[in-house]
A protein has these predicted regions:
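Domain-level signature for soluble enzymes in the chorismate/prephenate branch of the shikimate pathway
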Residues: 1-96
Length: 96
């Protein structure tokens, strides 16, 4: 396999992985909306810092075991948590 062919193959695989990540993000967003509905029924706030801290701890454990950059992992987690909170707040506003 030539260098160019190998490069193209790897780029194609990288694109595929990126698209799978986006599909998983969509699923995560769907779960956040369902969580918002339950929180609304139970009159619970959007934020639960103990849940966030536990997720952060578990995320760092996985990042370390996979030899990934912790800063990157935390930035990604914060982005995901921020989007979940945004969706939950939006859902709560719609029901108010």
């Amino acid at each position: 396999m030539t260098g160019i062919a190998e490069l193209e193959k790897l780029r194609k695989e990288m694109a595929s992985v990126t698209f799978e990540i986006l599909r998983l993000c969509r699923r995560r967003n769907e779960l956040a909306e369902k969580i918002a509905e339950i929180k609304m029924r139970l009159n619970l706030p959007v934020e639960d810092l103990s849940v966030e801290e536990d997720l952060k701890r578990r995320t760092l454990e996985i990042c370390r075991s996979q030899d990934m950059d912790e800063d990157f992992c935390l930035k990604l987690l914060n982005l995901l948590i921020g989007e979940s909170k945004r969706l939950q707040r939006e859902k709560l506003k719609m029901k108010a």
